[in-house]
Amino acid sequence: MHAIILTMRVGIVGFGNMGQAFALCFSKKLGKENIIVTDKVQEKRNLATEMGIAFASDVKFLADNSDVVLVAVKPKDSQEVLQKLKDYKGIILSIMAGVSIEKMEKILGKDKKIVRVMPNVNVAVGSGVMAITDNGNLSEEERSKVEELLLSCGTLYRIEERLFDAFTALAGSGPAFVFSFIDALALAGVHQGFSYEQALRIALDTVMGSAKLLKEFQVNPNELIAKVTSPGGTTIEGIKYLEEKGFKGTVMECINRTSQKAKKL
């Protein structure tokens, strides 16, 4: 398995933020010499060169020199790119939001090896959270190879495709909501007299430590809330206010609306 991974050559179509993030992760696993990228914005060539990654002038050349092709373009550009991959015989990974396997098969054909992945921005630091499904045309060896490749970028959840829009809202957009919460904590710290920089560090360390504690204890969050909350104490006063303002309901509706938007893409 590891020998197969080390000899893979991965092509990435679309060298935006996510394409760059995956290029960095994959290069750590495979070596930069086994990564090739392309983008319709030719200025991205300079960026690829700075990163030490080969830049292909077009999709066909990239596909001809890749065992796996990752499609990392905007949904509006999906048809144009997929048309250029109709003759490709390797594995196609798509991280395009809202572009189902069925839509891809209509362009590529039902015989193609298609894997749909929904990542989040945390891939950039190797801590991404990704959903994965495929159209059933991959062998077990190919499926394992793809999963091992992606695990170099974070954690992987194999789910039904019908849940992808919900996953997009929860994990794909989730980091932005977490960043907003951290910013709110930091601003609250400023209101209490800290500098923003110090308050941000305190908020960030608090969130990271809390997440680590919850993950290691593997309990319901409410159990840890109870450990922090003393009867008649300071924490319960804050919890009470959050509940009065509908904090949990607001977060739930935030995810619901984001999921509904994903369905419309």
UniProtKB/Swiss-Prot annotation:
Its EC number(s): 1.5.1.2
Xref: InterPro entries: 6-PGluconate_DH-like_C_sf (IPR008927), NAD(P)-bd_dom_sf (IPR036291), P5C_Rdtase_cat_N (IPR028939), P5CR-like_CS (IPR053790), P5CR_dimer (IPR029036), Pyrroline-COOH_reductase (IPR000304)
Entry-linked Gene3D superfamilies: NAD(P)-binding Rossmann-like Domain, ProC C-terminal domain-like
Keyword Transmembrane applies: no
Entry GO CC: cytoplasm
SUPFAM superfamilies per the UniProt record, alphabetical: 6-phosphogluconate dehydrogenase C-terminal domain-like, NAD(P)-binding Rossmann-fold domains
Protein's GO biological process: L-proline biosynthetic process
GO molecular function: pyrroline-5-carboxylate reductase activity
Electron transport among keywords: no
Main localization (coarse): cytoplasm
Major enzyme class: oxidoreductase
Keywords: Amino-acid biosynthesis, Cytoplasm, NADP, Oxidoreductase, Proline biosynthesis
Catalytic activity: L-proline + NADP(+) = (S)-1-pyrroline-5-carboxylate + NADPH + 2 H(+); L-proline + NAD(+) = (S)-1-pyrroline-5-carboxylate + NADH + 2 H(+)
Family the UniProt entry places it in: Belongs to the pyrroline-5-carboxylate reductase family.
Protein name: Pyrroline-5-carboxylate reductase
